[in-house]
Curated annotation (Swiss-Prot):
PROSITE patterns: GATASE_TYPE_1. Pathway: Pyrimidine metabolism; CTP biosynthesis via de novo pathway; CTP from UDP: step 2/2. Catalyzes the ATP-dependent amination of UTP to CTP with either L-glutamine or ammonia as the source of nitrogen. Regulates intracellular CTP levels through interactions with the four ribonucleotide triphosphates. Keywords: ATP-binding, Glutamine amidotransferase, Ligase, Magnesium, Metal-binding, Nucleotide-binding, Pyrimidine biosynthesis. Allosterically activated by GTP, when glutamine is the substrate; GTP has no effect on the reaction when ammonia is the substrate. The allosteric effector GTP functions by stabilizing the protein conformation that binds the tetrahedral intermediate(s) formed during glutamine hydrolysis. Inhibited by the product CTP, via allosteric rather than competitive inhibition. This is CTP synthase. It comes from Onion yellows phytoplasma (strain OY-M). Its EC number is 6.3.4.2. UTP binds at S19, K194, T195, K196, P197, T198, Q199, K230. CTP binds at S19, D154, I155, E156, K194, T195, K196, P197, T198, Q199, K230. GO terms for biological process: 'de novo' CTP biosynthetic process; pyrimidine nucleobase biosynthetic process. The lineage of its organism: Bacteria, Bacillati, Mycoplasmatota, Mollicutes, Acholeplasmatales.
Length: 540
């Protein structure tokens, strides 16, 4: 294919001055506005780190690992993209420097470069450009928004910036747009906005051969027209192409703020795209109004091992918020360090909360504290939601304290346990090495809470796990007619959902429902959990 025959338009988003400016939220917000106007939009994240993917990175380093339907372990920004766009990303939506270099080195070993010296230019840059084309074709996109990780000036980003510089020539001027986000500091003492960091950031970007057509200025105060004109003159940018990204209390306000400033009109004009509908953002306006006028509060205890960095549970936090908004209540999460939970303090730690959630995790650290929390929820009729490891530990807790299987455990924790109620997955997947990754079907059992919540026969949910409930113990667990395996993957005979008949709301799942929750379409399990927690609050 001749690159100039490609019909897709590309928006490249870079960041300057400091990291964590909200490039991902900017990308997701623009994506939602353009989708709303009738365009088919996909978003891609280019990460300059050498890791192949974040799958083996510490949650303290990187936050959560977001899993796509096709089993890719990706950057948490893809969660923002999916939640804002309500579109599924794919493994093509997250590209790392590690993937690029690995691919090029493999091709060199296979002799595909015909003995040439393999260099950053052209081989690495061509590989990056091919990834841009791949995501456009795979998603059949009218517009691909590409976020470049890191900050302009980082040495790791150099090949990516060079590649996106080249695509303007390769794809055509009106098919490419460069958007640069910068910080505009406000000095409270002097009551003055400082533009110098933005000037230097744009200067550095231009030195690399990239002239941004749009600036998005992150600021805690509104930026007056005089300041915008000053930045426009010194950065050689149309004043009409300078937009504010003011600090907001609700992330989704960014969609309305950028649309109100006309960023979508400017983008469509640049791409010479006409005959697209006006944006109808009424549903987002209603959501924001609802959030601003919440009348109740629900308090959830999250008992985890990575609680120092809340981003390790970002999608769970967002899914709980989505469900809470539906019930007109503000979410308050109490972060409980599972390592500090003991039999002596468990009651004082958890007695005041409306619901208890035990999320995922790997390894044996903090396991016993989570099991204590599950036992407390079960024996005190407090709504309980277990996710991934949370389900495995619910199985262990029940085995020990109800079935009296002394020493019951997971093979991940104790390879010599006499009762391995949690074992390694029986059927290996080709995706992600030793992990079961991606979306799989789950058949729901009739006359169960799970079936009532989903109101479907078959559901599809995303997975990321290495261990699971041992199917050889299922009959023993279900013998007393209380413990129910209510969701099963029939193809591989895997236990996906467990629940208790005698408990008001005790459900644990092997998969990650948080990855499918959307602000305008909360996940049914999270809705059910929040509803049960509110009922528990009422009955106290």
């Amino acid at each position: 294919m001749n690159n100039k025959d490609l019909k897709t338009k590309f928006i490249f988003i870079t960041g300057g001055v400091v990291s964590s400016l909200g490039k991902g939220i900017t990308a997701a917000s623009i994506g939602q506005i353009l989708k709303n106007r009738g365009l088919k939009v996909s978003i891609q994240k280019l990460d300059p780190y050498i890791n192949i993917d974040p799958g083996t990175m510490s949650p303290y380093q990187h936050g959560e690992v977001f899993v796509t339907d096709d089993g890719a372990e990706t950057d948490l920004d893809l969660g923002h993209y999916e939640r804002f766009l309500d579109e599924n990303m794919s493994k093509k939506s997250n590209v790392t420097a590690g993937q690029i270099y690995q691919s090029v080195i493999n091709k060199e070993r296979e002799g595909k470069y015909l003995g040439k010296t393999v260099q950053v230019i052209p081989h690495i840059t061509e590989e990056i450009k091919q990834k841009l084309i791949d995501v456009a074709l795979f998603h059949k996109s009218d517009v691909v928004i590409v976020e470049i990780g890191g900050t302009v000036g980082d040495i790791e980003s150099s090949p990516f910036l060079e590649a996106i510089r080249q695509v303007r020539f390769d794809f055509g001027y009106h098919n490419v747009l460069y958007l640069h986000t910068t910080l505009v500091p406000y000095l409270k003492k002097a009551q003055e906005i400082k533009t110098k960091p933005t000037q230097h950031s744009v200067k550095e970007l231009r030195a690399l051969g990239i002239q941004p057509q749009i600036l998005v200025l992150r600021s805690e105060v509104p930026i007056n027209p005089e300041t915008k004109n000053k930045i426009a003159a010194l950065c050689d940018i149309n004043p009409q192409a300078i937009f504010e990204a003011l600090d907001v209390d609700i992330l989704y306000q960014m969609i309305l703020n950028l649309h109100h400033q006309g960023i979508d009109d400017f983008i469509l004009q640049h791409f010479k795209l006409t005959n697209f509908s006006n944006a109808d953002l009424q549903s987002w306006k209603q959501l924001i109004t609802r959030i601003q006028n919440l009348e109740k509060k629900v308090v959830i205890a999250l008992v985890g091992k990575y609680i120092v960095l809340h981003d390790a549970y970002l999608s769970i936090i967002e899914a709980l918020k989505h469900a809470s908004y539906q019930y007109n209540c503000k979410l308050e999460i109490k972060w409980i360090d599972a390592e500090k939970v003991t039999p002596d303090n468990i009651s004082s730690l958890l007695e005041d909360y409306d619901g208890i959630l035990v999320p995922y995790g790997f390894g044996n650290r903090a396991i016993e504290g989570k099991i204590l929390a599950i036992n407390y929820a079960r024996t005190n009729n407090i709504p309980f939601f277990g996710i991934c490891l949370g389900m495995q530990l619910a199985v262990i807790e029940y085995a020990r304290n109800v079935l009296h299987l002394q020493g019951a455990n997971s093979l991940e924790v104790d390879e010599k346990t006499p009762h391995p109620v949690i074992t390694k997955k029986i059927v290996d997947s080709n995706l992600g090495g030793t992990l079961r990754l991606g979306s799989y079907p789950c058949h729901l059992k009739a006359n169960t809470k799970s079936k009532a919540i989903y109101n479907q026969e078959i559901i599809y949910e995303r997975h990321r796990h290495r261990f699971e409930m041992n199917p050889h113990y299922v009959a023993l667990f279900e013998k007393n007619n209380d413990f129910v395996v209510s969701g099963i993957n029939q193809e591989q005979k895997l236990c996906e959902i467990v629940e208790l008949k005698s408990h008001p709301w005790f459900i644990a799942v092997q998969f990650h429902p948080e990855f499918l929750s959307r602000p305008l379409k909360p996940h049914p399990l999270f809705k059910g959990f929040v509803e049960a927690s509110l009922l528990n609050q009422k009955n106290k």
